[in-house]
Each structure stands twice: as C-alpha cells, then as structure tokens.
C-alpha cells in the first residue's frame, strides 16, 4: 500500500501515527482511513485512489495477527519514533530552503536551474559542490575536480587516453551529477522531450554501454553544458 520509497513520506508517517496498530485499523471505517490518506496528500492523490489504498490496508489488517497488544509500550514507542522522524524531516526541509536561498545569491543559480529536469534543490547542491565555476580555466580542470577525467592506461608502447574515470576528485559532485542525470532522463522520457542528456544517453545505449557507463558519460556531458552556460552567462 505504501511503497518502500514512500514509507518515510508525510502520508505514510501521518497514517502510522494515527493508526499504529492493526486492531485500531480494524475498528475504523474504510472512509476514515481514506480521509486520513487524502488529507495527508493535500488532494494530490484522487480520493478514489485513497479509497483503494484504504480498502487494501483494511484487508491486510483483518488478516493479520499482531504479536503485541494495542496498549503496549511498543505501540507508544512507534508513535514517538514517527514524531521524531516528522520533526527531523521538517528541519531538513528548512535546511534545504536555506541552502537554496544561499545558492540563489550566486550568478549561477538561474543558469543551472534553466536546464530542463534540474530542480532548485539539485541546482543548489551542484553549486555547493562546484563552487565558483569561473575559477576553472577549461572543462578539463572541472572534469578533474569532479573526478570525471579519464585515466591514461599504458601497456608497453600502447597508450589508451580514454580509460575509466579517475574518481580522484569530488565524489559528492559526481554523485549529485549522476542523480541529476537520472532525474533529467526520467523527466524527459515521461514528458516525451528529447533533451540533450536523453539523446546522449540513448546514443550510449546504442553503443551497448551498460547503465553506469551511460550515466557517467551523461554526467560528463551535463558538466560540459553547465560549464559552457556559466562561462557564457547564458540560459539553457
């Protein structure tokens, strides 16, 4: 009913806090369960979907055999843990807003944020890791800073200048670029938009590259785009 990705989301946590035991769910009407879900989603999820989820949860509760009583200390502990998670999540959201506001004070925010598929949070993270992009004289320096520069492999008289990436640079920057590329590709496919990153990803797929190689190549491509845009002070 709640996927593993959503278990720590607002909807799941509010539901668990309100109905922390199967016996409590058994005693509630389906519409009461659905109303809780609908309220937490702020209307984003259609009420019919909320009813479907509520029916499934009710069915699972009716077929369950809890190992603890509804008034046990474990149930109270669960409620307390949920409160802590909600509190920390709210604080994390506040920190994200502060980081975004700081990033907006730089000349790079609007430029990077104009790239399709990159949201404000990702933009702020990229700026936080790359810093002042104008301090890099060329893209090779920026690639090396992120550890995306290729290694040189020498075997006898043979030299391969296009080996695997060095991974010697900023690993956080690589991770953010990797995740951002995945987000751009998903959004591009969902909305049927042939962005530069999606086109490049499909090109690498056609070359029979495996997923990680494709995304690594896309990360390098994205970094080149960001570097050129920031140097030329131009939007996407």
Regions found by a protein language model. Name each.
Residues 1-236:
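A detector of single, family-specific signature residues
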């Amino acid at each position: 009913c709640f996927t593993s990705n959503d278990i720590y989301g607002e909807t799941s946590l509010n539901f668990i806090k309100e109905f922390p035991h199967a016996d409590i769910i058994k005693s509630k009407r389906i519409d009461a369960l659905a109303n809780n879900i609908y309220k937490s989603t702020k209307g984003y999820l259609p009420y019919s979907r909320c009813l479907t989820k509520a029916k499934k949860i009710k069915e699972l509760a009716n077929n369950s055999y809890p190992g603890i009583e509804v008034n046990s200390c474990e149930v109270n502990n669960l409620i307390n843990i949920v409160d802590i998670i909600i509190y920390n999540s709210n604080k994390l959201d506040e920190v994200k807003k502060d980081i975004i506001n700081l990033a907006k004070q730089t000349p790079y925010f609007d430029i990077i944020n104009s790239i399709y598929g990159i949201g404000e949070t990702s933009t702020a993270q990229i700026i936080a890791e790359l810093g002042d992009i104008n301090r890099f004289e060329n893209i090779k320096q920026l690639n090396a800073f992120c550890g995306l520069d290729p290694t040189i492999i020498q075997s006898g008289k043979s030299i391969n200048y296009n080996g695997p990436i060095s991974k010697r640079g900023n690993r956080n920057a690589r991770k953010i670029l990797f995740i951002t590329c995945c987000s751009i590709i998903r959004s591009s496919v969902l909305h049927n938009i042939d962005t530069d990153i999606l086109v490049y990803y499909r090109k690498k797929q056609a070359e029979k590259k495996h997923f990680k190689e494709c995304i690594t190549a896309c990360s390098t491509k994205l970094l080149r785009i960001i570097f050129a845009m920031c140097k030329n002070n131009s939007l996407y």
